[in-house]
Amino acid sequence: MGGIVVPWLALALLLLLVMAGIEDARTREIANWKNAAIALLALPWWWANGLSGIDMAWQLGVALIVFALFFAAFVAGQMGGGDVKMIAALALWLPPGAVLSMLMVMSLLGGALTLLFLADRWRRRAAQVAEIPYGIAIAIAGMLAIANPFLTHFGDA
């Protein structure tokens, strides 16, 4: 339905994810405008992919559940607020099953990133535990999910 719009929206998402991952690596923060742009661009993505009103409601419901679950991690001090918002914004782009796949990939990448940071801490014999820029894992998992055509078939559900 969306023809040429779909690749441009996917490219915009890719650029936003790259910028968010780089920003998180440098500053341990993700700007609210990036997460807002990711979330808002999901609306034309839905239209371009021909989602019905019911499908859009499901997308929104899944994103709200994802936000609530990861908000609990934020409250527990295990994850930053920008990370939580980015995960929920990405959930708006993906069919429910693909959200689960993206979260599994994100967890594996985040675990690997954590191990790298722990190894670096041990190598430098640093006493303080560095914050993990989890936005990197979220961004890569999101890029993989959008790039994988088996995960993003909206009309097949």
Question: What do these predicted ranges mean?
Answer:
Residues 1-157:
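A membrane-topology feature that recognizes alpha-helical transmembrane segments
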